[in-house]
Amino acid sequence: MQEQYVPQSIEPAVQKHWDAKKTFKAVEKVDKEKFYCLSMFPYPSGRLHMGHVRNYTIGDVISRYQRLNGKNVLQPIGWDAFGLPAENAAVKNNTAPAPWTYENIEYMKNQLKMLGLGYDWDRELATCKPDYYRWEQWFFTKLYEKGLVYKKTSSVNWCPNDMTVLANEQVVDNCCWRCDTPVEQKEIPQWFIKITDYAEELLNDIDNLEGWPEMVKTMQRNWIGRSEGVNISFAIEGQAEQLEVYTTRPDTFMGVTYVGIAAGHPLALQAAATNPGLAAFIEECKNTKVAEAELATMEKKGMATGLYAIHPLDGRKVPVWVANFVLMNYGTGAVMAVPGHDQRDHEFATKYGLDIKAVIKPADGEVDVSDAAYTEKGVLFASGEFDGLDFQGAFDAIANKLEALGHGKRTVNFRLRDWGVSRQRYWGAPIPMLTLADGTVVPTPEDQLPVLLPEDVVMDGIQSPIKADAEWAKTTYNGQEAFRETDTFDTFMESSWYYARYCSPDYDKGMLDPAAANHWLPVDQYIGGIEHACMHLLYARFFHKLLRDAGLVNSDEPFKRLLCQGMVLADAFYYKDEKGGNVWVSPTDVKVERDEKGRITKAIDNDGREVIHSGMTKMSKSKNNGIDPQLMVERYGADTVRLFMMFASPAEMTLEWSDSGVEGAQRFLRRLWRLTFEHVSAGAVPALDVAALTSEQKAVRRELHKTIAKVSDDVGRRQTFNTAIAAIMELMNNLAKLGSDEQDRALMQEALETVVVMLSPITPHIGFELWKMLGKGDDVDHATWPVADEAAMVETEKLVVVQINGKMRGKLTVPAEISQADVEKLAMADASVQKFTDGLTVRKVIYVPGKLLNIVAN
């Protein structure tokens, strides 16, 4: 029994014990309620950062809590191992992505173990292994056979430096999010999965996600973007083709004064063939910013095509303009423009001298659209037969007329677009499609799967090795020459179903073992960043429905409850170099002085240079303000780091790293160790006799059981882990009131056992050791979470403070149900009260039941 708390000596030993005993191995048990807890798996970048530590600690606390509550817990871990950073690192370090990735996995695995995370390592998977992506390829061919996969030429965001397609969300200020290179528009053939076929279900089922944060649900609803409107066909003067547009505001249709089309629209390209100026403008539009946030703020530009559309209801000719804010891959690539009632259209019309016509006004007034569009719904005017109609009346009447004339159709539209899964990179799962000599495209036969990605490659930093190697693509199909697809899957493919593969990671007869999948799924608790709301979390929901429709799972949704943890922030410091640039200095290399409010007033780096404090910001490589978790674990121990992470902030809020906060967490653990050591060193502990407890002892026991109730609710239901820890710390202060008689010691034993079990999900190593120290036979990992004793929480007595003229003059311990009159009698009979009322006349008595008696006398 060690007198001092030395985490560096106990933590490795406890971790070895867990490994040897396979404490966290999960086995399907039909007689025990299951709980599947999952944190988003890491990309093996080389080292864990504090964001990982926070995510995985939260998941581990929930898992351990559920295990102590008798659940059969599955908590697996694996590696989201494909992706561009491995290629960039391989080029930089003159290696191949595979060895770089596998080395990182090994290193990070040891880091995860060092944190004491209770994973079932037998289920570990890496998405870059053929036994994983084989089933992804197989599933893709099945989706192709069902008509849910297609290939088409598509305008994409192209990064010329990384030579890959970027999603709209990966374009920041018209530059690549990874390398800051200006993005171009490029037409290339791509594979798509029809997520739009599931748009309605994905939207409707959001209502069933009761355990998800409202913000994430709102983000997904907006991303899917269901709208009801009308598809309208315009005839083009002198052309056989019709121009299709979609609008949610057919009530404004009589106010159309021009039509905007995308630079890639067939009509635009046709007009440009004889118009060099237009051709040059279209070329310029190829580099238009396409991230939606930027579309709203960028300069609107356009050029007339010389073509005219015929308004289908009043026969007016309206000019057709190429506009840089109309995108070919959104909707039909054309929009009807109503500058009187749409501000973007108004700005464009004003800039280019186009007509602005008002057709909607408030029900109780007039409208002026000379300076700005009137965008509210109202009553129609200047609209012929539709004058006087309100929004819904006009919507129906105009839609009906367009349908009757064969120029329109009511339709439900979605902002969501089909999922482009092709990537022009090497380090990803090969797309399992073949092209035959005659151009026919077929899926790779099942007996040829997996299509293996060669790992022994040389990276030149320019072209994918499987694109550069003509021999790799050559294969046969039914005796014919065939060529493999050289694009690889978007890495969101792997992360869209990994949670299901954990249920049977070694199963080789299919993608999933249905019995195991249906035993564990859906995931009961998922933990990850809110930045994944509209991509990973939506794709995983989509994939789950695909798996269900393939008969592989029988649930509709993958994740019952979702917790989005906040970011980890740290102080950032910099100084200016000779050129005026910022040189960022690690906070671990800076000494600071603070004022009385804790604000930094001066900061000096290790070279004696005064540095500028730029505030608390997200830990990042760019600002050099990441705190190395390994360094912190080596210095303070994993339990201290875990305790600080869970205590310093509510789980879903940002967490500010603080050395003093970490030191405070360690002081608390030392105090707990010392208290337990002193208690155990005092010898054998008698049995607790509740009936024999004094009122002071009952008060301590009452606080103990109130704490059990609060911590159970905070951890289990509310997931406010910081308030649970605060309650345990407060309880520890109360334990100091206990003396050394037999029932004091018996009560201390009950309290320490309770505290150790309740803290063990957060600080499992010290929990393991203290449980043994307290003489408990089995591991704390197999203990039972304490249950609050309702009888102990009932207050039979109250402590009433007695004041004379607002000053405290005594305290009374009284029965809980005592009347005011009886409290007054006891107070007036109390010697210390009599001393201050002697010779005075009582004028008034104020009583706060069970708390305070204030006697006003003069």
From Swiss-Prot:
Keywords: Aminoacyl-tRNA synthetase, ATP-binding, Cytoplasm, Ligase, Nucleotide-binding, Protein biosynthesis
UniProt GO cellular component terms: cytosol
Localization annotation: Cytoplasm
EC number: 6.1.1.4
GO terms, molecular function: aminoacyl-tRNA deacylase activity; ATP binding; leucine-tRNA ligase activity
List of residues binding ATP: 621
Keyword Transmembrane helix among record annotations: no
CDD domains on file: Anticodon_Ia_Leu_BEm, LeuRS_core
Keyword Cytoplasm: yes
Motif 'HIGH' region: positions: 42-52
Reaction it catalyzes: tRNA(Leu) + L-leucine + ATP = L-leucyl-tRNA(Leu) + AMP + diphosphate
'KMSKS' region, short sequence motif: residues: 618-622
Intrachain S-S bonds: none
PANTHER family: LEUCINE--TRNA LIGASE, MITOCHONDRIAL, LEUCYL-TRNA SYNTHETASE
Family, per entry: Belongs to the class-I aminoacyl-tRNA synthetase family.
Protein name as catalogued: Leucine--tRNA ligase
Organism of derivation: Aeromonas salmonicida (strain A449)
Highest classification ranks of the organism: Bacteria, Pseudomonadati, Pseudomonadota, Gammaproteobacteria, Aeromonadales
Protein's gene: leuS
